[in-house]
């Protein structure tokens, strides 16, 4: 015997219909939340990597070792945070030529592509490029 709703009409199949209509919407929202979370976590990791890279470059004695130390430090920071993005690290070492006793800085920029293609969300790009820059002072009294 069919179940009758309070208003006297049939109530059969409404739950299945609601599920069919709402499931794609809920999955879309869930995908957006996951993408936002992944991007937010990656932003923090890339920012920390840029800071670490600039600090390591600032304690190096030559521009060549500064570049190598910055790249190594950025990769280690991203690996520590669980982000696998093959970073591009650029270091501005132009101020290594500033005479001792004068203030100088070194700037590190880290670029990282965060993959989003594994999330099946319509309209979402396949990846997002994150870029962070940090400037660290060079010791004005240390020979460069």
Question: Model segments located where?
Answer:
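Short, conserved structural patches
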Residues: 2-4, 59, 63-144
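Alpha-helical assembly-interface signal, strongest on the long, hydrophobic N-terminal helix that forms
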Residues: 1-72
């Amino acid at each position: 015997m069919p179940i009758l709703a309070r208003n006297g009409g049939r109530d059969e199949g409404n739950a299945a219909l609601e599920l069919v209509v709402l499931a794609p919407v809920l999955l879309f929202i869930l995908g957006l939340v996951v993408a936002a979370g992944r991007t937010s976590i990656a932003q923090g990791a890339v920012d920390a990597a840029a800071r670490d890279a600039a600090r390591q470059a600032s304690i190096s004695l030559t521009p060549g070792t500064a570049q190598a130390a910055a790249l190594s430090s950025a990769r280690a920071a991203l690996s520590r945070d669980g982000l696998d993005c093959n970073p591009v690290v650029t270091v501005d070492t132009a101020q290594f030529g500033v005479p001792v006793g004068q203030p100088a800085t070194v700037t590190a920029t880290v670029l990282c592509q965060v993959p989003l293609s594994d999330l099946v969300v319509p309209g979402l790009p396949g990846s997002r490029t994150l870029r962070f820059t940090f400037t660290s002072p060079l010791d004005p009294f240390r020979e460069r």
